[in-house]
Amino acid sequence: TWDDLVLPVAVADGLRDFAYEGGIRDELWHQPQLRRMFPSGRGLFLLLTGAPGTGKTMAAQVIARDLGLNLYRISLATVISKYIGETAKNLTRILARAEHMDAVLLFDEADALFGKRTEIKDAHDRYANTDTNHLLQAIEAYAGVAILTSNKRGNIDPAFIRRLRYVLELPRPDVGQRRLLWRRLARDLARVADVDALGRPLDALAALDLTGAQIKYAVLAAVVAARRDGGAVTAAHLLRGVDRELQKDGRSLSEREREVVAHAV
């Protein structure tokens, strides 16, 4: 739900605006003057950028649910072809099917499909850029709803970005947002009866620079650890979950960070 997204107000408003427009798009484009001014490019596209774990996929899921539509994640392996012109044909076929089904398309890691065109150095580059032009035409002809995600906006070809009505960056959560995430997940996921009793440890954990996804999986790991120990989730379990998440990135808590959390328990 929208409540699951912990984002800056401006970003959250942008997502809600996109979802609202998605809900009224049929009514909107029935207006003759709008159809006359926009003979093409009526599709509703959203580019979500941000570091891994900042909630791009979750935002797409929330939007699709709000619209009451299925969310179809497109495997780029089914789109991208080494043969010139085939990628655009594959995309056109997928877009036509999605428009007929009235679904929301999700292009995860869209850089591979909508990346910057290269400087022309040989015939291969010229053909590759021609394929990109065909992709642009396919995008302009699509009248449905689609969401693209990328870790970095600069990876996407500016020509694609100019055709997108909505471009939003999901930042890493600040300390206040992390505190809210820790408290909310401790209550809803870990079933902590008295979140305030864990207030100090949760505040200490909120000082750690983690993404929303890392916090969510750290709490899940704490739930499993507590079940294994046969008791309720404690600050020690949460700290164990943080350790596991950081290990994925080849990181670990510094002694100072560990002392701060331990002192708060």
Protein language model annotation of sequence segments:
Residues T1-V6:
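Interdomain "pre-motor" coupling segment immediately N-terminal to P-loop NTPase/helicase cores
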Residues P8, A141, L208-T211:
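Membrane-interface junctions
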Residues A10-G199, D203:
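Walker A/P-loop NTP-binding motif of AAA+ ATPase domains
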Residues A207-H237, D243-R251:
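AAA+ ATPase "lid" subdomain C-terminal helix
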Residues S252-R256, V260:
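C-terminal regions of RecA-like/P-loop NTPase motor modules
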Residues A264-V265:
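Accessory N-terminal regulatory regions that flank AAA+/P-loop NTPase motors
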